[in-house]
């Protein structure tokens, strides 16, 4: 959700979450602030990460689609794996574009230039197009997109009451 990118503090993420999940880096909100203040960046950067994820998705799809012609056994299982790679890529594309749109919104918060908000709109529209492709690829095959069916789980969204378990519901 866009609000998780432009205001992550609203979601009361426990303080050690980022430190425990990977190498040092910056949240998008920190990245944009440092850009505006002309401060040096530290560690992994949000725009680099989303670019890498898109690249990995493209490579995964190219490799598995190329391998498809050579599959002679376990074709159904291979088809599921192939679908996984296409899902990964669509999610990567959707998230990449959403991060770029969120960057524009954060730029607006700093500079008050309405052109930043205008520039965010097509990025979000493209992000939604890729998300809809993800939904289509997972509609009959995937459940528990939010990974936990509890009220305590808030990221990406709560799963209490058996809701928000598929990509379509989210």
Where are the model-predicted features located?
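C-terminal non-catalytic alpha-helical accessory regions
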Residues: 1-166
């Amino acid at each position: 959700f866009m609000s998780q990118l432009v205001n992550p503090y609203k979601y009361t993420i426990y303080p050690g979450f980022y430190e425990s999940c990977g190498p040092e880096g910056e949240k998008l909100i920190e990245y944009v602030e440092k850009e505006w203040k002309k401060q040096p960046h530290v560690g992994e950067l949000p725009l680099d990460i989303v670019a890498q994820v898109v690249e990995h998705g493209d490579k995964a799809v190219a490799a598995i689609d190329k391998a498809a012609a050579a599959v002679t056994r376990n074709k159904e299982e291979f088809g599921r794996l192939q679908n996984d790679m296409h899902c990964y890529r669509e999610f990567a594309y959707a998230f990449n574009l959403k991060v770029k749109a969120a960057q524009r919104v954060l730029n607006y918060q700093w500079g008050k230039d309405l052109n930043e908000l205008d520039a965010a709109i097509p990025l979000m529209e493209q992000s939604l197009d890729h998300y809809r492709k993800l939904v289509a690829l997972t509609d009959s095959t995937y459940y528990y997109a939010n990974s936990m069916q509890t009220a305590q789980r808030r990221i990406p969204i709560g799963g209490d009451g058996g809701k928000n378990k598929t990509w379509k519901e989210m």
